[in-house]
A protein has these predicted regions:
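N-terminal "arm"/small-domain region of PLP-dependent enzymes with the aminotransferase-like
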Residues: 2-61, 190
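Active-site phosphate-binding strand-loop segment of PLP-dependent enzymes
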Residues: 137, 141-194
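Conserved PLP-binding catalytic core of the aspartate aminotransferase-like
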Residues: 40, 281-288, 295-329, 351-353
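Conserved PLP-anchoring active-site segment centered on the Schiff-base-forming lysine
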Residues: 104-123, 148
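Conserved N-terminal alpha-helix of the aminotransferase class I/II PLP-enzyme fold
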Residues: 54-97, 287
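Structural motif of enzymes handling amino- and sulfur-group chemistry
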Residues: 257-276, 282, 295
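PLP-dependent enzyme catalytic core of the Aspartate aminotransferase-like
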Residues: 40-44, 48, 52, 81, ...
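Active-site PLP attachment segment
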Residues: 213-244
Length: 377
């Protein structure tokens, strides 16, 4: 490792407006960048109910060891059992969505395997693909026909094929048709992995659950750091796969388990999810209103969900736009390469259930005015 080379690389990132820094958010800003979609993490009444329900003297702030040593306490076992009751398949809790996604792929697939992945899948999925040393093929984003062409071409050449998709995509705010992908399993022999990071909670137990597709999905991954208002992830799969992960997944075996209090909160949210239906319906009204407002203002987006992507293109213009909005009281982060493809830098705007229509309307009108000022519309 050459320090001079690292310094040069960091300078290049700065010159290209791609240098990342860690900042403390100003809580006075109106937040259009939060992934707390249902507003659960900031619901004081909900938190109070949680605190009143349990004697926290019994719940430690660390598990002190991995699940295979002394970290598999009663709370996490109850949580996994509850997930199994709801989804009809065994569950294994991982420390994060990143660990869950990468672990599934790198544990079950190897250099003899073929992995076919949506081009815009999350970095955690690509991490697993690379670590597995499998052959990797990417299909055009959301294009099930392109996926089928690859399956038709390669299905005879590989005994071990994995197809990976997300439900809601976090940078474009669009959705995959997992029903169509599941239907391909009737004709082609492959394993299917689905990541529901940005749909769990927003759509109740998730899109796969709502469309009764859990049985057709070999690995259903549900990260909890978005609408789940927490940390960790569920991997929902057959018992034999769960046992294999317990015995072979390095990230599971060698990681200190999540603290009991975190999984107690995960269990509390899971058990109360059925009570959030009014909140979910109100949230979907906000989504419909926002997309309608964008159309009315002639602001273009490919988004169809609660994540609204406004593509600017140029890094500097996107950063300047984000900074200008911050000066006006809005937090809307600029997303740049390599998180998104080159020349597609954007504002990623996320809605939350505790927003008001009048505030959303005011924000989008302000956004349009600022876009005009810097000459991007």
């Amino acid at each position: 490792m050459q320090k001079e080379k690292i310094i040069q690389e960091l300078e290049e990132l700065k010159n290209d407006n791609r240098f990342r820094t860690i900042k403390t958010n100003d809580k006075s800003l109106y937040n259009f960048s939060s992934n707390d979609y249902l507003g659960l993490a900031h619901d004081k009444d909900l938190l109070q109910k949680f605190y009143q329900n349990y004697n926290f003297d019994n719940y430690k702030l660390s598990s002190f060891s991995s699940r295979l040593i002394d970290g598999s306490y009663l709370t996490v076992m109850r949580l996994e059992k509850k997930v199994e009751e709801i989804y009809g398949k065994p569950c294994l809790v991982f420390n994060s969505g990143f660990d869950a996604n990468s672990s599934v792929i790198e544990t079950f697939f190897d250099k003899k395997s073929l992995i076919i992945t949506d081009r815009l899948n999350h970095a955690s999925i690509y991490e697993g693909c690379i670590n597995s040393r499998a052959k990797i093929l990417r299909y055009k984003h959301l294009d099930v026909s392109a996926l089928e062409k690859l399956l038709k071409k390669y299905s005879e050449d590989y005994d071990d094929i994995l197809v990976v998709t997300e439900t809601v995509y976090s940078m474009d705010g669009d959705c995959s048709d997992i029903k169509k992908i599941c239907d391909l399993k009737d004709e082609y022999n492959f394993n299917l992995m689905v990541d529901e990071a940005h749909s769990y909670g927003v759509y109740g137990y998730g899109i796969a659950y709502n469309e009764k597709l859990v049985d057709k999905i070999d690995f259903l991954v549900i990260p909890l750091g978005k609408a789940g208002a927490s940390v960790g992830a569920y991997v929902i799969c057959d018992e034999v796969y769960k046992n294999y992960l317990i015995n072979k997944s390095k990230k599971f075996i060698y990681s200190t388990a999540l603290p009991p209090v975190n999984n107690l909160w995960n269990l509390f949210i899971l058990e109360n999810l059925v009570n959030f239906q009014d909140r979910i319906e109100k949230f979907q009204e906000l989504v419909t209103f926002s997309l309608s407002m964008l159309k009315k203002l002639n602001l273009k987006t490919k988004s169809t969900t609660h994540i609204i992507s406004i593509i600017i293109g140029d890094n500097l213009n996107t950063v300047n736009l984000s900074n200008n909005l911050k000066e006006l009281g809005y937090l809307a982060y600029a997303i740049k390469e390599p998180t998104v493809p080159k020349d597609t830098a954007r504002l990623r705007i996320s809605l939350t259930a505790d927003m008001k229509k009048e505030d959303i309307e005011k924000f989008f009108k302000t956004l349009k005015a600022e876009m005009k000022k810097i000459g991007v519309i």
